Amino acid sequence: AGGIAEMSHMGHEIREITDALDAAGNTTAAIGKGFAISSAAFVALALYGAYVSRVAIPTVNILDSRVMPGLLFGATLPYWFSAMTVKSVGIAAMDMVNEIRRQFQDSDVAEGRKEPDYESCVIIATRAALQQMIAPASLVMLSPLIVGILFGKYTVAGMLPGSIVSGVQLALSASNSGGAWDNA
């Protein structure tokens, strides 16, 4: 809201009001992110307990040679997923940039005499969002299956807590840095 007020050259008093609203919104978002991350962590732990119970593993010893590789691999999964997601956003953004460049080659659009084709931009964004998330989603869904088939239930019992702990730390870090960037 503050950016819109500034770009539209509204008075200083309007900007003060929008700054207060922005601060309230940022605080609410930060609290909401904390609750979301915490609840996701607890749900993941509950699902892990259900997995261990279902496959009848009496105890999970992290020093076991079948568990430790899974723990290390699981710890890398959230970072791998995040890297794939960020790369996907870059690819989708370039698709959009290329479409906008194509439209601005029409001098009528560039000079404001003709409306741009907004629908093609929406289609590109939707298609890119769906296509580019196939690989990251496959990583998340197929990793436990592949690890379980190749290495067994004990390695999966290591992989899952590795990804839970690493994922929570990554989520907290991303939430805090995102909040800092938002307020910069």
Model feature map: region roles:
Residues A1-A184:
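Hydrophobic packing and interface segments
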